């Protein structure tokens, strides 16, 4: 029973770690997209640059929103997967239903994923500083 519950706990931790990596990857991709769009914008005529910068900012905002949704979705899937595995274990007689979700002392365990904050404004969403960018000055 303890081995089974520890295995489920480790599975939850793995899914949470994967979700964090996904969130970081999405944020990094948004930064790279912005860099690329700004580079192209610096090579275009004056009137287009403002539009390209606006598109880059909107892309960054949307990716941030999607990143938060991905983490929330993965967290929900992980929780349902663990619940389903526990139900299967109880149905097959591997563990007793009255022992499901209880620690060694017999008290209910706190869920890892329920208490995990999902904050789209966390550090994983910080974009690279724009110090390396320079405003476009059109040639006369």
From Swiss-Prot:
Source species, domain of life: Eukaryota
Keyword RNA-binding among record annotations: no
Positions bearing Phosphoserine: 129
Modified residues (N-acetylmethionine): 1
GO MF annotation list: actin binding; alpha-tubulin binding; arachidonate binding; beta-tubulin binding; calcium ion binding; copper ion binding; cuprous ion binding; cysteine-type endopeptidase inhibitor activity
Annotated Sequence repeat ranges: 20-30, 31-41, 42-56, 57-67
One BP term from GO: positive regulation of protein localization to cell periphery
GO cellular component: actin cytoskeleton; axon; axon terminus; cell cortex; cytoplasm; cytoplasmic vesicle membrane; cytoskeleton; cytosol
PTM characteristics: Phosphorylated, predominantly on serine residues. Phosphorylated on Tyr-125 upon osmotic stress.
Free-text tissue specificity from the UniProt record: Found only in brain (hippocampus, brainstem and cortex). Specifically expressed in neuronal cell bodies and synapses.
Record InterPro entries: Synuclein, Synuclein_alpha
Keyword tags: Acetylation, Cell projection, Copper, Cytoplasm, Membrane, Metal-binding, Nucleus, Phosphoprotein, Repeat, Secreted, Synapse, Ubl conjugation
Region (Disordered): 99-140
List of residues that carry Phosphotyrosine: 125
Subcellular location: Cytoplasm; Membrane; Nucleus; Synapse
UniProt region (4 X 11 AA tandem repeats of [EGS]-K-T-K-[EQ]-[GQ]-V-X(4)), positions on chain: 20-67
Segments of skewed composition (Acidic residues): 128-140
Region (Interaction with SERF1A): 111-140
Residues that coordinate or bind Cu cation: 2, 50
Family: Belongs to the synuclein family.
Quaternary structure annotation from Swiss-Prot or TrEMBL: Soluble monomer. Homotetramer. A dynamic intracellular population of tetramers and monomers coexists normally and the tetramer plays an essential role in maintaining homeostasis. Interacts with UCHL1. Interacts with phospholipase D and histones. Interacts (via N-terminus) with synphilin-1/SNCAIP; this interaction promotes formation of SNCA inclusions in the cytoplasm. Interacts with CALM1. Interacts with STXBP1; this interaction controls SNCA self-replicating aggregation. Interacts with SNARE components VAMP2 and SNAP25; these interactions allows SNARE complex assembly and integrity.
Function: Neuronal protein that plays several roles in synaptic activity such as regulation of synaptic vesicle trafficking and subsequent neurotransmitter release. Participates as a monomer in synaptic vesicle exocytosis by enhancing vesicle priming, fusion and dilation of exocytotic fusion pores. Mechanistically, acts by increasing local Ca(2+) release from microdomains which is essential for the enhancement of ATP-induced exocytosis.
Name the record gives this protein: Alpha-synuclein
Gene: Snca
